[in-house]
Regions:
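Mature catalytic core of soluble alpha/beta enzymes
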Residues: 1-268
Length: 268
């Protein structure tokens, strides 16, 4: 909040925050802005999942978008400069950052050899190997499930890995038959319309898994899969027609459970 309050000025930040922002800004650039940590004002304007959620006026959206854009943030070591009016929001990577912090802690605990951590369902991390050597199995939500215990399938994690899911079913409201969800397309100022309903990413760091799942939701299947390649991450995309698209690495991890879905190849 202090950083946002001091937009337009140079501000000293911690080494830790600087490191996180450097990684997030790289993902923003690599995704051509599909992930953007500067859309805080836009997220607050829609307030989806909050008490004041609404469809904003077009003029309101344009007004907050002029203050958005990852290019408005520059880092020089631990000195940050944001254009005046720019507002950071790290919510799209918050759980992933939390997972990375947990890993740092676990690595200092000599009496902990293995663990599975669930941060609210959308972010999961595994640490070490199970005693019997088998994979950790993590259920993935069916984006259109009628019951909470209806799962799309299971993803196998091995050793220390991070899984993040972004979907249009987590926070949303429906007005005039249209679903307005919380994952914003920074280029339009509206909820992303890429044809996907859910994306799951497996990566070797929590921050990247979290931010990449958001970026891939905005980008859609083909562009999202290309982005994951550059990070050596595995991905699963669910579209509106009940198709599941798997990257090569995810094919070895994923087992489909939901009968109403079919697995398709990604067209490259």
């Amino acid at each position: 909040y202090k950083v946002n309050a001091d937009s337009g000025k140079d501000k000293e930040i911690s080494d830790e925050l600087s490191g996180y922002l450097e990684r997030l800004l790289k993902i923003a650039k690599d995704s051509e802005g599909a992930f953007d940590p500067t859309i805080g004002k836009l997220i607050r304007l829609w307030d989806i999942g909050g008490e004041n959620q609404k469809i904003p006026e077009e003029a309101e959206i344009k007004n907050v978008l002029k203050d958005s854009g990852y290019q408005k943030v520059s880092l020089d070591g631990t000195t940050i400069h944001m254009d005046e009016g720019c507002s950071l929001d790290l919510g799209a990577a918050g759980k992933g950052i939390g997972c990375d912090s947990i890993l740092e802690y676990l690595e200092t605990q000599k009496d902990v050899s293995a663990a599975l951590m669930n941060l609210g369902g959308s972010s999961v991390m595994t640490y070490g190997s199970k005693p019997d050597g088998s994979s950790w199995n993590v259920a993935v939500t069916d984006p259109r499930a009628e019951n909470d215990d209806d799962y799309l399938g299971v993803v196998a994690l091995n050793g220390t890995e991070f899984l993040s899911t972004s979907g249009d079913y987590e926070k949303y409201f429906i007005e005039d038959g249209v679903r307005y969800h919380h994952i914003m397309d920074p280029s339009t100022g509206y909820p992303a319309k890429s044809g996907v309903t859910g994306v799951t990413v497996v990566c070797d760091t929590g921050l990247e898994a979290d931010a990449l799942s958001t970026a891939c939701f905005v980008l859609g299947v083909e562009k999202g899969a290309e982005l994951l390649k550059t990070y050596g991450a595995d991905g699963l995309f669910v579209d509106e027609d009940h198709h599941v698209y798997l990257t090569e690495g995810m094919k070895e991890r994923f087992s489909l459970l939901a009968d109403s879905y079919s697995v398709e190849d990604i067209i490259e």
